[in-house]
Amino acid sequence: MAILGLQGVRGGVGTTSLTAALAWALQILGENVLVIDASPDNLLRMSFNVDFVHQGGWARSLLDGQDWRDAGLRYTSQLDLLPFGQLTAQERENPQSWQETLGEIGSAIQALKASGRYSWILLDLPYGASPLTRQLVSLCDHTLAIARVDANCHIRLHQQALPAGAHILINDLRIGSQLQDDLYQVWLQSQRRLLPIVIHRDEAMAECMASKQPLGEYRSDSLAAEEVLTLANWCLLHDAGDKTSAGSLR
């Protein structure tokens, strides 16, 4: 099994919606998936039909001294969700007060991996490098750095470090945009970790969260859903390739 982290090169690039879409695609392919919201924004739940007023989550449980496992939610027989949980206004203003407590989730994720219960654990990671985020990134077997083809992300790709071994996944690529086409050609020549898969702009991606469903469940026939399914297959092949390479060293 593998722990896969998805993190935006900046905020607002669609990481959360992509995480939900990839989790759905992997379970469509027969994989057992746990998707974990690692962001204090607590938005991943909104892609899995969780009531807006639901405040529970693994972080909320740890802060309240409760068992984080009770915060897990079943979406399908092969897809489970672990929301972050809602922080209070005071907690949001003082993140340093809870970073250490929430660090306990690291050992929990390692135990889940060792149990073999899930084929994949997907982490929806927030942008930035807080102590908690750095800890979770270090647990990942693979990391996808989500980027949009714009000047903002172009600059960031040259001035901020990506997680070790991360692959860059382009999201929201617009057909007919001269600027995006020019930058994309530059990235093809300069970004050695660029994935050979692109997620194009698709209205279904915006609509699915409004419908509180993962992309592939909401519109399986959409272009973006088909591209995410291709991404899921790439993840399976890439993970299998890593295991084969590791085995050949013995």
Curated annotation (Swiss-Prot):
Protein name per UniProt: Cellulose biosynthesis protein BcsQ
Function in brief: Essential for cellulose biosynthesis. May play a role in subcellular localization of an active cellulose biosynthesis apparatus at the bacterial cell pole.
GO molecular function, one term: ATP binding
PANTHER family, per the entry: CELLULOSE BIOSYNTHESIS PROTEIN BCSQ-RELATED, SEPTUM SITE-DETERMINING PROTEIN MIND HOMOLOG, CHLOROPLASTIC-RELATED
Binding-site residues for ATP, renumbered to this chain: 9-16
GO cellular component, one term: cytoplasmic side of plasma membrane
Principal subcellular localization: cytoplasm
